[in-house]
Amino acid sequence: KGTMYNSGCKIDIIDTQKKMGDLFVHTGKIKKGTINIGQSVNLEIDLEKRNNSKANHSATHLLHESLRRTLGKHVTQKGSLVSPERLRFDFSHNKPIEKEEMSKINKIVNEVVESSTDVQTRIMTPKEAIKMGALALFGEKYGEEVRVVFMGKESNGFFSTELCGGTHVKNTKEVGKFKIISQSSIASGVRRVEALRDKQLTEHENSQEKDRTLKEKTNKEQLEKIKKEILSYKIKPDLSENKDLVENLKNLNKQLEKIKIQNVIKDKNKNKIKDKKISDFIIREQVLSDFPPKELRSVIDQGKKDIKKGIII
């Protein structure tokens, strides 16, 4: 991404793709002026977006290998998205990633990042690359020569070895702190993870913390409100010290619901009952105000006990 311009026009480049070998296709939006075939233009890269895309691309390679080491060698890439803001990776796996596995995947990636090792690239034949253990995309067509990207030095070689023609960081430390923020299933046997790194991750975590703080404040206010309402019925709220705020809030809501139901049933203005007796048969007309519909079954059950033979309306 960047800008294409000359004295007569300015175009914002929003995407660049390599097609049919060495043909580069730029997709852009004209912001000013006009452009004609044959004109010369200047190209200016948006360095911040470029650097973020590089780091997210390198992080994707580290993520791929970390997934394979944690979940198993059956993990293969099924798709990916690398943008300046985030990265997304689709892979073969038939069940959700467990909490312990997720922690391990993130830990492995961050350990390679923190090792601060140089990223290496080499040009070789596809056969040589595969012999070295390089991962290749199934169904992808490769030429006589391929570019292989090596990341993270280990005693017996490299942490990650993949065929790749894309842009990458020079050193793993440029990736910054990494974390998977979501996972989902997109097809049978295919999982998707989305991840953030560095500045975007910090912003995401700060936003989450802000949301948590606000939610906790709202829950505390709601808890106090319910406690006061329960006390207004001259009943002591039942709170457990062993349960967290959210659990206590749920329990108090249930207590308040039961109290309200009992008070409606006891209140003759809100629970109007009119029985009409025909021989040994009773027709009961009952009108309830401010009563939750889901609790009507309990009222009907009580009515059955009151009248052995009859109809409740």
Regions found by a protein language model. Give the residues of each.
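Terminal appendage regions of diverse proteins
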Residues: K10-I11, H74, T172-K177, I181-I313
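Conserved nucleotide-binding/hydrolysis modules and their immediate coupling elements
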Residues: K1-L43, E48
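Non-catalytic interaction/regulatory segments
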Residues: P84-I186, A195
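Conserved phosphate/anionic-ligand binding catalytic regions in large, soluble enzymes, centered on
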Residues: K1-M4, A55-L71, V75, G157-R192
